[in-house]
């Protein structure tokens, strides 16, 4: 059995979906999950990447032990398209999938997970995918097939427009309340209680612990958005600033690709579950891109990876 493999390799877990191609259409036949990946240059980065690809593929192949993977595409967090990092990752995929008879894949592509997500969400034609979860990135495709990205540089460099940004700014707001720069508000205790803190000193100590990271900041975002909806002026300003940043990224992609009335698909917990934040983004966009059309994703990142793998099989070697 000849199969295509599509991977969605994130920081928390990796999914592999296998598919047959019948009459030009993809027919999924298996799915497996493995651990997450990190940047290849991070400590144990290559080892984690190998384990993620190998484990998820093995689980997906459990009901197809004789299956041969003809082509594989991986959308991975931290991979920059067109770099040496991409080439290293592709070599690792070939190594990870040297299964069964030990043969190596001839057709492999590793790219950023935002690109497989865009292909899955908008398989054909022009459109923009805005991802706002723990992090944020916007990627669009023009009428000519050209793609342009905005944001996605990581929280250390550019985390605005994300749940991390909302939570991080919210925590900073509570410290300004605590030291008297701003009037106190119930949001302060709500955030501190969620963090397990009872004082500003405890907050300061908590954020430097090894087990406190971007996801923990992001987990504070719902409290900030809820406080904004109840009239907390500081929280309202945070939500508005973050919404403007995300909207500006969407606008920048639309302008770069000359899209006057783009289809915009949103993914990620911040933009899909935090309604106050989503509404703020939509209101801002109505001013900057009045012709924008909001739509639903046709598929997920694994679907996008499989479509790209199918492209590899018809592309001349």
How does the language model describe each region?
Residues 38, 57-96, 100, 109-110, ...:
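Short beta-strand-loop/turn "lid" adjacent to the catalytic site in phosphate-handling enzymes
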Residues 94-103, 146-154, 284-293:
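Glycine/charged-rich beta-loop-alpha catalytic/anionic-binding loops adjacent to active sites
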Residues 125-177, 181:
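Glycine-rich phosphate-binding loop of actin/hexokinase-like ATP-binding domains
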Residues 80-82, 116-118, 137-138, 271-274:
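Short, active-site-adjacent cap segments at secondary-structure transitions
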Residues 1-69, 120-128, 173-317:
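ATP-binding/phosphotransfer module of carbohydrate and carboxylate kinases, centering on a glycine-rich
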Residues 12, 78-79, 134-137:
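Short glycine-rich anion-binding loops that position phosphate/pyrophosphate groups of nucleotides
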Residues 99-129, 140-148:
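Active-site neighborhood for divalent-cation/phosphate handling
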Residues 39-40, 78-80, 152-160, 291-296:
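A short glycine/serine-rich beta->alpha loop
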């Amino acid at each position: 059995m000849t199969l295509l493999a599509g991977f969605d390799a994130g920081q928390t877990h990796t999914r592999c979906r296998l598919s047959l191609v019948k009459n030009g259409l993809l027919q999924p036949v298996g799915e497996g999950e493995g651990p997450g990946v990190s940047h290849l240059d991070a400590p144990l980065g290559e080892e984690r990447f190998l384990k993620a690809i190998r484990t998820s593929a093995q689980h997906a192949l459990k009901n197809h032990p004789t299956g041969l993977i003809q082509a594989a595409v991986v959308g991975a967090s931290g991979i920059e398209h067109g770099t040496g990092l991409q080439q290293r990752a592709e070599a690792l995929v070939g190594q990870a999938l040297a299964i069964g008879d030990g043969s190596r894949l001839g057709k492999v592509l590793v790219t950023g997970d935002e690109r497989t997500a865009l292909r899955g969400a908008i398989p054909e034609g022009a459109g923009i995918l805005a991802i706002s979860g723990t992090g944020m990135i916007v990627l669009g495709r023009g009428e000519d097939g050209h793609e342009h990205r905005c944001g996605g540089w990581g929280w250390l460099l550019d985390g605005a427009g994300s749940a991390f940004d909302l939570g991080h700014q919210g925590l900073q707001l509570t410290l300004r309340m605590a030291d008297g720069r701003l009037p106190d508000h119930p949001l302060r205790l709500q955030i501190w209680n969620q963090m397990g803190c009872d004082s500003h000193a405890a907050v300061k100590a908590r954020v430097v612990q090894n087990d406190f990271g971007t996801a923990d900041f992001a987990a504070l975002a719902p409290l900030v958005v809820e406080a904004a909806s109840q009239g907390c002026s500081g929280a309202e300003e945070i939500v508005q600033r973050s919404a403007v940043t995300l909207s500006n990224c969407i606008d920048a992609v639309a302008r770069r690709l000359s899209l006057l009335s783009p289809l915009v698909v949103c993914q990620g917990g911040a933009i899909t579950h935090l309604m106050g934040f989503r509404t703020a983004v939509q209101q801002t966009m109505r001013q900057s891109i009045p012709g924008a059309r909001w739509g639903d994703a046709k598929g997920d990142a694994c679907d996008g990876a499989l479509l790209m793998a199918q492209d590899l099989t018809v592309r001349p070697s």
